[in-house]
Amino acid sequence: MAELTTLARPYAKAAFEYAQAHQQLADWSAALGVLAAVSQDDTVRQLLKEPQLTSSAKAQSLIDVCGDKLNAPAQNFVRTVAENKRLELLPTIAEMYEQLKAEQEKSVEVEVTSAFTLSKEQQDKLAKALSARLSREVRLHASEDASLIGGVIIRAGDLVIDGSVRGKLAKLAEALKS
């Protein structure tokens, strides 16, 4: 995973810097999202692994599958990535691009897993509190996991806050063992 990140970082940065310079952050976000989704399709994945195909043929196939969702600079980006035999990195590149974009926009994706369904009011209150703590605009994604017993687990980038009953019981059990 760390190796993929290391290899993908320069491509994500290059795409981000180009998009930022041309005020096309949203367009590039959409294009990279499409490329990531298409490249994860089983049929396309097999095509990209085909040793008989040249890099330019693989790039053109990917561009053809994406159709008009890629503008000329995005198509050139695909060709460059293909020339360097890095098409398998497209999902990681897209993910890293989104992180750079979120950093630029001072926003953060927050995943909240709770034991029970959170009401809209609870989600809004939690988003507001996290926004104040993180000094960023928070985009909250809520999910449910009954195995937590109670409470919530909040994930925002590298930050993890485990306020679940399951987490507290695990800590208590660990303390009793030592």
From Swiss-Prot:
InterPro entries according to UniProt: ATP_synth_OSCP/delta_N_sf, ATPase_OSCP/dsu
Lineage: Bacteria, Pseudomonadati, Pseudomonadota, Gammaproteobacteria, Pseudomonadales
Topological category with respect to the lipid bilayer: Peripheral membrane protein
Signal sequence range: none
Source organism of this protein record: Pseudomonas aeruginosa (strain ATCC 15692 / DSM 22644 / CIP 104116 / JCM 14847 / LMG 12228 / 1C / PRS 101 / PAO1)
Gene name of this polypeptide: atpH
Keywords noted in UniProt: ATP synthesis, Cell inner membrane, Cell membrane, CF(1), Hydrogen ion transport, Ion transport, Membrane, Transport
NCBIfam families: ATP_synt_delta, PRK05758.2-2
Subunit structure: F-type ATPases have 2 components, F(1) - the catalytic core - and F(0) - the membrane proton channel. F(1) has five subunits: alpha(3), beta(3), gamma(1), delta(1), epsilon(1). F(0) has three main subunits: a(1), b(2) and c(10-14). The alpha and beta chains form an alternating ring which encloses part of the gamma chain. F(1) is attached to F(0) by a central stalk formed by the gamma and epsilon chains, while a peripheral stalk is formed by the delta and b chains.
Family statement: Belongs to the ATPase delta chain family.
Protein name (database record): ATP synthase subunit delta
